[in-house]
């Protein structure tokens, strides 16, 4: 019999996905170990919609800003302002937001360790083990796990070691700079507005952003083109926003998955969540809500495994996610592939967003995380407007 410490669930990665899974399982009375590396902050605009605030009980004090509108900037510098009617998009600083989520999990009973994951192994009785290096002691430890949740981000080591096909995942790369909000504001500055730049020199296949974070701002961009300089593009973006002289607080970069992995479990005791599972929305790059939802679904699947012993239940995490959000991801993927492919198309895309029907349906879907079906005539109108832009018949 092994003398290694045993947990019901070991969760690798303490971002929104892993911390949410740890919290949910600990509240159910499960013995949970949450492993996370200290000092790792992911580049992220920090936007969380009302659905995330409601579903995951996010307190107001974590919101460093409340965005009341979005501005879309075309290649010609044409601007389209879109008000967020009757609500707001919460903005968080990931450094503090993620730590709060981890602390909430610990308060519910999860055990936290500052550690670097090394590998999944097998004990002498066949139970899985997790081997990690302690961040404080630099000592190697082994624990036993009845179930494992891999929430260790894009290029997940857990996924690549345990889930078939995970190594084939394709990625885009994101980079941003957190800067101090200047005391003397640029003439067009608005601390309650998210600015989105659809311009090829800032990204050949994505967009650049300037998002308010209260006393700071997130300024960044992303691309799948490995030869494209994200740092140079961000420098240009800062100049365009009048923030080239703002003090830089920190710089962060990381890969992001391009689409959900075809499989999230190993058919035995491992299930993936968050970026490790590929749940970053195409076109928008949104990941916080989907990561937290993925963490919750992974926790549900792990709980069912612990109760029933039936490993087939692990596949339910992906099935449930794709049932509710797969169509949205597919639509966003098509949209990004087409509209972000040239400045001519970007110009038409921004022009199309002047339409009030497009604005309302887009924000209704974003805020509530579901395709809006209540107004079929509006969908028909948008279809014909879309076709006019696709065929070049609409005025820009």
Question: Predicted segment positions?
Answer:
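Predominantly flavin-linked oxidoreductase catalytic cores and closely associated redox partners
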Residues: 104-246
């Amino acid at each position: 019999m092994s003398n290694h410490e045993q947990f019901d669930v070991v969760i690798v990665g303490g971002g929104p996905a892993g911390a949410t899974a740890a919290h949910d399982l600990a509240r159910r009375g499960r013995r949970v170990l949450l492993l996370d590396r200290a000092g790792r902050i992911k580049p992220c605009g920090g936007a969380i919609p009302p659905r995330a605030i409601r579903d995951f009980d996010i307190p107001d004090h974590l919101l460093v800003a409340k965005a009341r509108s979005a501005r879309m900037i075309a290649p010609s510098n044409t601007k389209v302002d879109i008000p967020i009617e009757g609500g707001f998009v919460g903005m968080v600083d990931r450094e503090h937001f993620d730590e709060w989520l981890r602390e909430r999990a610990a308060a519910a009973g999860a055990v936290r360790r500052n550690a670097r994951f090394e590998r999944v192994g097998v004990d002498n009785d066949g139970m899985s083990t997790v081997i990690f290096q302690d961040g404080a002691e630099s000592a190697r430890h082994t624990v036993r796990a009845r179930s494992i949740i891999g929430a260790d981000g894009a290029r997940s080591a857990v996924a690549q070691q345990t889930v078939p096909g995970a190594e084939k995942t394709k990625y885009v790369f994101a980079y941003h700079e957190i800067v101090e909000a200047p005391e003397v504001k640029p003439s067009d500055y608005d601390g309650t507005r998210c600015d989105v730049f659809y311009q090829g020199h800032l990204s050949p296949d994505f967009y650049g952003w300037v998002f308010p974070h209260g006393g700071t701002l997130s300024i960044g961009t992303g691309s799948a083109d490995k030869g494209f300089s994200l740092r140079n593009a961000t420098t240009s973006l800062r100049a365009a926003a009048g923030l080239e002289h703002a003090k830089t607080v920190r710089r962060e970069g990381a890969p992001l998955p391009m689409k959900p992995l075809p499989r999230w479990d190993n058919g035995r005791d491992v299930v993936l969540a968050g970026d490790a599972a590929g749940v970053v929305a195409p076109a928008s790059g949104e990941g916080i809500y989907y990561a937290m939802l993925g963490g919750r679904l992974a926790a549900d699947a792990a709980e069912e495994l612990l109760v029933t012993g039936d490993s087939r239940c692990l596949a339910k995490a992906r099935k449930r996610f794709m049932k509710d959000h797969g169509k949205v991801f597919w639509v966003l993927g098509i949209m990004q592939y087409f509209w972000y492919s040239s400045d001519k198309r970007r110009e038409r895309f921004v022009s199309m967003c002047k339409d009030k029907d497009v604005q309302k349906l887009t924000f209704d879907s974003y805020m509530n995380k579901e395709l809006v079906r209540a107004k079929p005539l509006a969908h028909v109108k948008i279809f014909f407007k879309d076709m006019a832009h696709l065929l070049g018949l609409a005025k820009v």
